[in-house]
């Protein structure tokens, strides 16, 4: 409100200037404002009225200085000594006031007064007429009548008082009397307010949130002001609501506010009476009081509750008047003190958007009204369009009453549910509460989405509170209005209609078509007819409602008494079929069957008006009656025949009245339909979070099913007597979910949720139902997929009911009749009794066991998330595997738990249903959402105890049939029993193609994959088995854990906003692979920290089983979130430290593992790499894992790899992942990559593991090497057929695998090595443990990688080392190679090139110094100190000092890197090393120059990359060490590897190689010389020289390269080229030589992937091949150089090679080999002997093994001749490992730059050239070599081996290695 209005009231002229009047009074100047001209400022003198002594204030008034007249008055107030400031400016005679700047005349004089101008006699009437509207405007604007109006009438009788309320704390109030002192200016007032309230007041707001920004506004504003500091305004009512107390301002406030009780009321009353039409602004005392808090949401004043009483006049009137004349009732009362007070009742009809906002306010304000709890006359309330949505979960605020949209034709009284909630009566004193009801806990309100059709919304609020314990059965009273008023949308029960003003909840189903209105789902009543439901449906509904056990009453009672009344509350439908009218009877007589006590209680309660509101308006149909129900004896086993209903009817019903049971199952179904006041239309799926609200199964007779045309065939009678007993117990569970059980859901089990053997014949509706409502019928027609209201109800009840047990039952859905397919694969309702979980509130919440229809293994879903029935895609792809009913087993059908953040069903379904989309989200401000989100975070962390399969399996499995009633009997026990998946069931589960789940939702739709023929029972079994046995409960684990009853809608909102939804384009921009890697690395580090803090311990369960961290549901959920955010990142799987991985849990959750990252577009990110299109299916594969395997992951080692995922290799990968101990790295790195298996599997993310491995790798590698060596020695690997090289390689592989896996503890690392070997072998696991011989036979290698993974996963921890001896040599080699290479690459990547670091630090130093200079210059300029010599001196000294410090720190950092790089190799004094290095470098250069002449293949030169280069290459390639890039399938074949490498290597080589240009030039010459046809010998001689150097870095690669002579001989500088050649040439050779070409390519690929490419080595080794072939063959170096040597030996060139190679080199090589032999048993045995040609062959084989192990190491070597490559790989592996362990690959690599080379030479030379001057160094390396030989653990052994091999093989001196 601006000052003008205020002035207007006081001065007639200002308010609405009437030209005629003003013209008469005001000078003409005022009427001709100059708009176009720039007028000069007006010099005006302002005098003080009544003070002739005042000299006056002269101001220059101009539009620029004073924008408004109000600002001018503020200025005058500061200058004039007026007690209340300047409130009016008049002409000198005071005849009329001024209200506009234009009215001022230049040079004029005006009088200023602190009073409003007196009203002229001419205008009194006009003023009075106008004042009401003005008052109204102000009241609406400011929240209160403008006090000035009264002053204008009364004159300044008394000083004005203002009530100051502290922002956010309405209890702190102070009254201030305005005086001249505190109103001189706004600042003075703020100071006074600060003094009173005792905190700094910076801002003042009206109660409506309008900021008071000027003194005039303050003076003219309302009498109650909110004082705030710098924080934002907070609505008073919200604060009050939270406190659940009505606004109680001080009595002063009440009196000060007109319209409140107190003397002031008279005036307002008098005036209002004068304005009999209610036109005068009149605020009822309640409205006045509410004014303080009623504007929480402000803009629309009509907040429910006290504010509502505000007269319409107080609100701006929208185009259509909100209030009709006859909608206002007034009462004038005489107060005890003699004052008058007025009560006005106004019935508002909000139009358009106001309805939504109003409903929000009503919900918020309902707290006050709730306290009153008085039922509002439904007729009064009926007009309100707003319908209250329960809290996010459909939990209604106890006191809050939702407004249902009201159809004029329907006099729809609010349901009993409405009654249950205090009726919304704006006139009722908020403080008064109806007897018997205490203030109810506050609940969140959600706005129902208005349906497009004029659906009548009824309040569906279920008020669970307030029922006495005696009200055990709220079962709708038998006296349902059988006569439903056809005309009324909501028929009233005759007795309840007027007497209680509430409908009986029971009758509500029929009477209100409550299902229609309540569900809000298919609100279109027109479809069903006047009643909105077909008569049959109505009757059924009635019967159900009648029969429905007053579960609510129990819940209520439990809430009130905290205990459940099970038996009584369970009403059993006793009506015999005859009794039940199959369709037409409006009411099923079942009500009579209800236990009398229930009926009586209910009836009484319903009759009681006070109780009426208690009864939830939604019929809670809980048919306690179960045919075998042992509960109440009266229950008849006879099931009521279900009335036949047309599919259309079903749909309509489903749509219209989801809560009501459309068809009574012939067997009475124990279920409660709790229609929470959630409109199904509401797309805001709160039910998602509620545990399966529809956790109940509705056993439906075949007849019932038959009755529904929708069901393709009659279902076997669902009634199973045994189920009945359980049902009664189950009924206790608060399945508040309003089940639209209307669909016949025949569950033979009467158990509430336990599905009886017979399938529920639920028509699967196309629309996805929120899992929350178990309604069999997904309301396909209903656009709202989730009936969140229903779920919400469940939560409400669950929250309130102490019952520990909650079942989440997925009702089978029979396809709609309209769907010809009508697959019977109903989501078989599987009673999934969630283990009793204590909700934080102590109330048990039904955990949602979310079922994925996909049949995939259960995805872990927190209970908060509702299970979405992953209905088949809109196609209702549910396989029409006969309903399990055919099987007759009562076992629950596969319960697919789907974790759907927003009740995500299949995406299609959600779209059809209108899933949670931003558009469907509740109408709330972001601030509100965030606030709610934060508010819902439990004060104390909720212990998320995820029960694993073991626990879940507690439920006895009754056989393939599945869990029986017994399982249900134990409420705490999950009903799911491990079931053996029927044959093919497992295959059936995974429906990769069928499942389309977004990353956020693991829910899978049954895909066509499921065998349609398979009985639903089988399918159920399979899922149950898979899910249960595998730990479906693990998936459930999340759901099983008790979550706070409040699963915040805000959480769903956030998920909906983050996830890609139908309503909007991709959720988040996809990040580049680089960024994704960074993010994933950061996320991995974050998770690792959490793990170290034992954040995931609880979810891992008992520590008896060692399970990896990723098994933790929390961990998986976190990863899933990260993956969802950054789908491009592959680092997720393995980023945790091994130490973190050594965690225990019952089993890993499949769901997360199964989750396939998808891009924002929905494309499976990993599918490209996965190779199989299935990988695109997010969870199908993983979910299909066999449960039994899941249960005993450690015991599964031998289980057939394909058992779970037959036909789904991807699944295998996941399954591997799932088993905690499975070797992920090796399997995933080697096999998965090769297979294109998902990288997603935990094992598949070597990067993560690599990171952790890198951190722990060095220490672990040493330890592991030692252990491996010992074991290998014990095993006498040679005896077992594994050459020593193989042993070392294996150990390396193990280390590498561990690093790749990055998912294991150190133990895991060791085991992964074994597993990796197994994967690489793809044959069987061959642990390196020397104690046991390999259990797996080579045939296993031939088995699919998935099998290997499984085996690995099964016993990798235990059998890993033991089975090493027996691994297939080839598999061993490959796995080892991959693992080692991955490890090497990772480790190499850890330490950057010292030269690069040095340059970078220097750049930083320069930049900093420049910045410092700039800063000092700026300082000089600022303080004008340019000529200050002292300052100059200070600055100079500072710069010098800083420069010295920076340089010193730079040197230190470089030294650190160098020292880390040189760890593995003892380095001699730097000076000696440098000299040696320089000599060697010169020699090498000379040799290289000559190489061109000797090069066997002049033109070709493989890129020679040092180990360091490998990681760099890897980075450049974007591949992750240990894992194939997600985008590219990993193909083990050489050709693919070549393709991948060729393009990458050049880049990588260029990037990686730091060789001097001279070297590169030399290398080119060498290549040319080779092309020229130089003899291999010459080339090899040169190569050895270079190789010596290279080998130190990439000895392995060099050796391999030597084998490949052609390109291998190329100098390192050409590493890129050499590498390319190697790939082209070496690969074939390797294949030929090794005989395992694929393996070699795999190794190469692995090497590439690992990022360790020993290209340079390969090149050198190629050259060496000719020269050193014999030597290599003989030399133990073959492990590294061995392969190369062997090949040359075969070629017979080795002897020549040796001869031609410089004697120094040979000596060095020999010495190194000797050292190796001494150091490493396998090296000595194999390589030393390898010198002989025959031994070369053996070495070749060994090399092969080594190569496999080496994969991580030299990949290019694989391409080299197989034997040569293999041995080379082995050696390179060793070297790499050595470098990895101690040196970064960069170190081994010998920095490209001379300096780096020198450094590397220093580091490497000792090992590489034992015989040479570096022999000193060699000596230390020798000891290391033995370690390597023994353990050949990834780190030290590899590097040492590499170094040695490099020296020996190269035959070069250290010079060769050093640059």
Curated annotation (Swiss-Prot):
Keyword entries, A-Z: Cell projection, Cilium, Cilium biogenesis/degradation, Cytoplasm, Cytoskeleton, Repeat, Sensory transduction, Vision
Keyword Transmembrane helix tagged: no
Disruption phenotype: Mice display scattered outer segment disorganization, reduced electroretinogram amplitudes, and progressive photoreceptor degeneration. In single rods defective cells photosensitivity is reduced. Rp1 and Rp1l1 double heterozygotes exhibits abnormal outer segment morphology and reduced single rod photosensitivity and dark currents, while individual heterozygotes are normal.
GO cellular component assignments: axoneme; photoreceptor connecting cilium; photoreceptor outer segment
Reported tissue expression: Retinal-specific; expressed in photoreceptor.
Assembly: Interacts with RP1; has a synergistic effect with RP1 in photoreceptor differentiation.
Name of the protein: Retinitis pigmentosa 1-like 1 protein
Native source species: Mus musculus
Gene from which this protein is expressed: Rp1l1
């Amino acid at each position: 409100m601006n000052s003008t209005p205020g002035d207007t009231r006081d001065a007639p002229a200002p308010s609405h200037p009437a030209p005629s009047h003003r013209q008469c009074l005001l000078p003409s100047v005022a009427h001709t404002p100059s708009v176009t001209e720039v007028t000069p400022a007006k010099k005006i003198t302002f005098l003080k009225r009544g003070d002739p002594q005042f000299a006056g204030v002269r101001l220059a008034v101009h539009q620029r200085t004073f924008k408004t007249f109000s600002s001018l008055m503020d200025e005058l107030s500061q200058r004039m000594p007026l007690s209340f400031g300047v409130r009016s400016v008049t002409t000198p005679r005071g005849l009329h006031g001024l209200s506009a700047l234009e009215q001022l005349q230049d040079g004029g004089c005006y009088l200023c007064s602190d009073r409003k101008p007196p009203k002229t006699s001419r205008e009194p009437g006009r003023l009075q007429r106008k004042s009401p509207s003005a008052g109204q405007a102000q009241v609406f604007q400011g929240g209160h009548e403008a006090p000035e109006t009264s002053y204008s009438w009364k004159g300044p009788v008394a000083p004005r008082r203002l009530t100051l309320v502290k922002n956010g704390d309405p209890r702190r109030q102070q009254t201030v009397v305005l005086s001249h002192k505190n109103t001189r200016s706004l600042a003075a007032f703020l100071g006074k307010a600060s003094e009173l309230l005792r905190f700094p007041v910076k801002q003042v707001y009206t109660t409506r949130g309008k900021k008071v920004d000027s003194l005039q506004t303050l003076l003219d504003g309302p009498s109650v002001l909110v004082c705030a500091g710098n924080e934002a305004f907070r609505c008073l009512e919200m604060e009050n609501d939270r406190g659940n107390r009505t606004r109680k301002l001080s009595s002063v406030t009440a009196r000060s506010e007109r319209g409140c009780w107190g003397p002031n009321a008279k005036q307002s009353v008098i005036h209002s009476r004068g304005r009999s039409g209610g036109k005068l602004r009149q605020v009822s005392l309640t409205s006045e009081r509410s004014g303080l808090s009623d504007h929480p949401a402000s803009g629309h004043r009509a907040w429910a509750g006290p504010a509502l009483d505000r007269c319409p006049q107080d609100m701006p009137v929208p185009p259509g008047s909100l209030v009709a004349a006859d909608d206002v009732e007034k009462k004038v009362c005489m107060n005890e003190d003699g004052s008058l007070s007025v009560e006005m009742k106004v019935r508002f009809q909000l139009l358009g958007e106001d309805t939504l906002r109003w409903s929000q306010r009503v919900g918020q304000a309902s707290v006050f009204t709730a306290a009153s709890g008085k039922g509002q006359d439904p007729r009064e309330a009926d007009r309100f369009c707003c319908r209250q949505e329960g809290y996010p979960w459909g939990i209604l605020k106890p006191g809050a009453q939702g407004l249902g949209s009201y159809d004029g034709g329907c006099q729809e009284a609010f349901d009993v549910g409405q009654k249950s909630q205090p009726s919304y009566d704006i006139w009722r004193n908020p403080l008064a509460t109806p007897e018997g009801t205490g203030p109810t806990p506050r609940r969140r309100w959600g706005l129902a989405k208005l349906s497009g059709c004029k659906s009548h919304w009824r309040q569906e609020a279920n008020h669970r509170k307030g029922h006495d314990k005696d009200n055990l059965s709220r079962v709708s009273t038998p006296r349902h209005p059988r006569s439903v008023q056809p005309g009324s949308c909501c028929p009233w029960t005759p007795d309840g209609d007027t007497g209680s003003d509430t409908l009986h909840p029971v009758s509500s189903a029929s009477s209100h078509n409550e299902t229609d209105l309540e569900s809000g789902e298919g609100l279109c009543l027109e479809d069903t007819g006047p009643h909105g439901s077909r008569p049959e449906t109505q009757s059924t509904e009635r019967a159900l409602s009648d029969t429905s056990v007053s579960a609510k009453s129990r819940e209520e009672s439990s809430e009130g008494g905290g205990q459940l009344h099970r038996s009584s509350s369970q009403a059993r439908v006793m009506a015999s079929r005859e009794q039940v009218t199959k369709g037409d009877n409006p009411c099923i007589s079942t009500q009579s069957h209800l236990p009398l006590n229930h009926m009586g209680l209910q009836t009484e309660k319903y009759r009681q008006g006070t109780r009426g509101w208690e009864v939830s308006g939604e019929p809670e149909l809980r048919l306690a009656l179960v045919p075998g129900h042992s509960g109440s004896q009266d229950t008849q086993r006879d099931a009521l025949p279900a009335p036949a209903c047309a599919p259309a009817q079903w749909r309509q019903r489903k749509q219209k009245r989801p809560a009501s049971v459309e068809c009574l199952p012939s067997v009475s179904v124990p279920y409660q339909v709790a229609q929470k006041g959630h409109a199904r239309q509401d797309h805001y799926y709160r039910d998602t979070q509620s545990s399966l609200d529809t956790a109940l199964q509705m056993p439906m007779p075949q007849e019932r099913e038959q009755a529904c045309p929708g069901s393709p065939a009659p279902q076997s009678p669902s009634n199973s007597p045994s189920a009945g007993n359980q049902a009664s117990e189950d009924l206790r569970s608060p399945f508040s979910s309003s089940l639209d059980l209307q669909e016949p859901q025949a569950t033979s089990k009467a158990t509430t949720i336990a599905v009886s053997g017979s399938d529920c014949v639920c028509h699967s509706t196309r629309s996805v139902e929120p899992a929350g409502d178990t309604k069999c019928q997904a309301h396909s027609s209903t656009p709202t997929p989730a009936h969140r209201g229903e779920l919400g109800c469940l939560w409400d009840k669950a929250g309130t009911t102490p019952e520990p047990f909650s079942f989440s039952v997925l009702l089978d859905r029979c396809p709609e009749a309209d769907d010809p397919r009508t697959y019977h694969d109903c989501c078989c309702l599987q009673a999934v009794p969630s283990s009793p979980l204590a909700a934080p509130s102590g109330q048990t919440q039904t955990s949602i066991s979310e079922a994925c229809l996909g049949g995939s293994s259960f995805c872990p879903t927190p209970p908060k998330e509702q299970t979405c029935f992953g209905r088949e895609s809109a196609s209702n792809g549910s396989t029409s595997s006969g309903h399990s009913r055919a099987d007759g087993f009562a076992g629950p059908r596969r319960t697919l738990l789907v974790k759907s953040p927003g009740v995500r069903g299949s995406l299609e379904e959600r779209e059809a249903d209108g899933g949670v989309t931003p558009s469907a989200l509740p109408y709330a401000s972001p601030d509100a959402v965030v606030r709610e989100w934060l508010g819902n975070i439990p004060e104390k962390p909720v212990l998320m105890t995820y029960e694993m399969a073991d626990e879940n399996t507690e439920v006895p499995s009754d056989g393939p049939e599945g869990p029986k009633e017994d399982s249900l009997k134990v409420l705490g026990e999950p009903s799911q029993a491990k079931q053996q998946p029927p044959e093919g069931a497992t295959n059936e589960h995974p429906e990769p193609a069928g499942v389309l789940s977004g990353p956020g939702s693991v829910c899978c739709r049954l895909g066509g994959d499921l065998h349609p023929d398979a009985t639903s029972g089988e399918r159920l079994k399979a899922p149950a088995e898979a899910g249960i046995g595998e730990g479906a409960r693990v998936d459930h684990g999340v759901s099983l854990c008790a979550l706070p009853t409040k699963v915040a809608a805000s959480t769903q909102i956030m998920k909906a906003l983050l996830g890609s939804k139908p309503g909007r384009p991709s959720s988040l921009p996809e990040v580049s692979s680089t960024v994704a890697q960074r993010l994933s690395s950061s996320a991995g580090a974050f998770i690792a920290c959490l793990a170290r803090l034992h954040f995931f311990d609880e979810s891992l369960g008992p520590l008896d089983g060692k399970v990896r961290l990723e098994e933790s549901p929390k961990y998986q959920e976190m990863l899933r979130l990260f993956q969802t955010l950054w789908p491009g990142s592959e680092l997720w799987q393995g980023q945790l430290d091994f130490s973190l991985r050594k965690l225990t849990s019952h089993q890993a959750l499949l769901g997360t593992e199964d989750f396939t990252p998808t891009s924002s577009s929905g494309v499976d990110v990993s599918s490209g790499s996965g190779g199989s299109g299935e990988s695109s299916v997010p969870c199908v594969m993983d979910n299909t894992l066999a449960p039994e395997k899941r249960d005993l992951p450690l015991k599964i080692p031998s289980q057939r790899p394909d058992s779970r995922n037959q036909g789904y290799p991807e699944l295998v990968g996941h399954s591997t992942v799932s088993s905690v101990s499975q070797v992920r790295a090796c399997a995933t790195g080697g096999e998965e990559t090769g297979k294109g298996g998902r990288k997603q599997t935990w094992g598949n993310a070597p990067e993560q593991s690599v990171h952790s491995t890198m951190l722990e790798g060095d220490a672990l590698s040493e330890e592991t090497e030692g252990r491996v060596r010992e074991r290998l020695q014990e095993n006498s690997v040679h005896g077992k057929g594994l050459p020593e090289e193989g042993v070392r390689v294996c150990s390396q592989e193990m280390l590498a695998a561990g690093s790749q896996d990055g998912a294991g503890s150190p133990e895991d690392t060791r085991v992964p090595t074994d597993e990796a070997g197994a994967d690489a072998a793809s044959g069987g696991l061959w642990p390196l443990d020397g104690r046991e011989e390999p259990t797996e036979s080579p045939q296993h290698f031939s088995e699919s990688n998935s099998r290997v993974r499984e085996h690995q996963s099964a016993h990798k921890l235990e059998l890993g080392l033991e089975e090493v001896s027996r691994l297939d040599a080839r598999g061993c080699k490959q796995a080892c190679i991959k693992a080692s290479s991955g490890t090497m690459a990772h480790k190499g990547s850890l330490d950057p090139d010292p030269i690069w670091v040095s340059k970078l630090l220097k750049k930083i130093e320069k930049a900093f110094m420049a910045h410092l200079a700039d800063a000092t210059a700026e300082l000089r300029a600022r303080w004008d100190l340019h000529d200050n010599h002292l300052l100059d001196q200070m600055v100079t000294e500072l710069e010098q000092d800083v420069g010295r410090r920076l340089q010193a720190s730079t040197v230190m950092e470089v030294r650190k890197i160098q020292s880390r790089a040189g760890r593995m190799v003892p380095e001699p004094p730097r000076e000696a090393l440098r000299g040696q290095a320089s000599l060697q470098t010169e020699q090498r250069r000379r040799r290289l120059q000559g190489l061109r002449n000797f090069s066997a293949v002049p033109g070709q030169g493989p890129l020679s990359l040092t180990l360091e280069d490998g990681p760099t290459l890897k980075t450049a390639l974007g591949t992750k060490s240990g894992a194939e890039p997600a985008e590219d399938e990993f193909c083990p074949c050489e050709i693919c590897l070549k393709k991948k490498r060729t393009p990458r290597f050049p880049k990588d080589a260029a990037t990686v190689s730091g060789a001097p240009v001279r070297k590169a030039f030399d290398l080119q010459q060498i290549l040319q010389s080779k092309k020229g046809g130089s003899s291999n010998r010459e080339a090899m001689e040169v190569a050895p020289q270079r190789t010596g150097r290279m080998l130190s870095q990439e000895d392995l690669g060099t050796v391999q390269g030597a084998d490949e002579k052609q390109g291998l001989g190329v100098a390192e500088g050409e590493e890129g080229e050499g590498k390319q050649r190697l790939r082209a040439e070496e690969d074939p050779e390797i294949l030929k030589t090794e005989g395992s070409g694929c393996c070699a390519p795999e190794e190469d690929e692995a090497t590439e992937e690992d990022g360790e490419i020993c290209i340079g080595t390969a090149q050198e080794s190629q050259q060496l091949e000719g020269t050193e072939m014999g030597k290599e063959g003989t030399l133990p170096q073959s492990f590294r150089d061995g392969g190369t040597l062997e090949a040359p030996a075969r070629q017979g060139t080795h002897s020549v090679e040796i001869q031609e190679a410089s004697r120094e080199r040979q000596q060095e090589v020999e010495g190194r080999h000797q050292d190796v032999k001494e150091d490493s048993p396998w090296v000595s045995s194999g390589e030393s002997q390898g010198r002989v040609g025959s031994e070369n062959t053996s070495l070749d084989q060994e090399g092969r093994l080594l190569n496999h192990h080496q994969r991580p190491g030299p990949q290019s070597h694989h391409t080299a001749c197989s034997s040569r490559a293999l041995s080379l790989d082995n050696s390179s592996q060793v070297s790499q490992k050595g470098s990895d362990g101690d040196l970064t690959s960069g170190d081994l690599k010998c920095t490209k730059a001379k300096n780096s080379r020198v450094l590397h030479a220093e580091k490497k030379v000792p090992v590489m050239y034992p015989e040479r001057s570096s022999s000193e160094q060699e000596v230390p390396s020798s000891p290391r070599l033995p370690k390597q030989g023994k353990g050949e653990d990834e780190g030290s052994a590899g590097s040492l081996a590499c170094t040695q091999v490099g020296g020996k093989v190269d035959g070069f001196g250290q010079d060769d290695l050093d640059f």
